[in-house]
Amino acid sequence: SDMAVLVKMNMRDGFRGGMELDETMQVARRLEQSGAHALVLSGGFVSKAPMYVMRGEMPIRSMTHYMTCWWLKYGVRMVGKWMIPSVPFKEAYFLEDALKFRAALKIPLVYVGGLVSRDKIDEVLDDGFEAVQMARALLNEPGFVNRMRAEENARCNCRHSNYCIARMYSIEMACHQHLKAVSYTHLTLPTSDL
């Protein structure tokens, strides 16, 4: 059949006891030998190390707004900043590890992790990655790909505040920069922690 098989895999899990590069490189080699068409290189484990995946700030108040269990909501509001510390955003934050996979494998690789500018995307592609995957940049600016075609120095305006992540398992995933307080019958959803 003409179906492409892409496997999204962690390079590191981002927490003590999780998988590290030496283990995941073995997995990648096995997937390459097994005939996968491409690997999408990611990292992190949302329930154990959420900021390893997301980077930036964690909007605790907005995140807890969607929790239905009252005691969990208030507990996370009280100690959440210590439970889920912020990790500074750096564009292409998985690139250093991904380059090790690029050097060791022949299989096509898709880079994912903090791409918000055409300059960095061009750099990643020049480093030998066959494709890139974006999420928050496109959530922030759905027309970003078209703007990159028109502007050499295009950069999206994502602020890495992660309000979109706080909304992810609720009514809709959306960039808070484009929302006003949205009312759904009796419910008003926060658009920021300020």
Which residues does each PLM region occupy?
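Hydrophobic faces of well-ordered beta-strands that scaffold small-molecule active sites
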Residues: 5-7, 39-41, 109-112, 132-134
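Catalytic cores of alpha/beta
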Residues: 116-128
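Glycine-rich beta-to-alpha transition loops that act as phosphate-gripper elements at the mouths
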Residues: 8-12, 108-119
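Short cysteine clusters
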Residues: 158-164, 175
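Glycine-rich phosphate-binding active-site loops on the catalytic face of alpha/beta enzymes
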Residues: 128-147
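Alpha/beta enzyme core
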Residues: 1-95, 104
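Glycine-enriched alpha-helix->loop->beta-strand junction motifs that scaffold or abut catalytic
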Residues: 34-36, 105-107, 126-132
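Conserved small/polar residues in nucleotide/adenosyl-binding loops
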Residues: 185-191
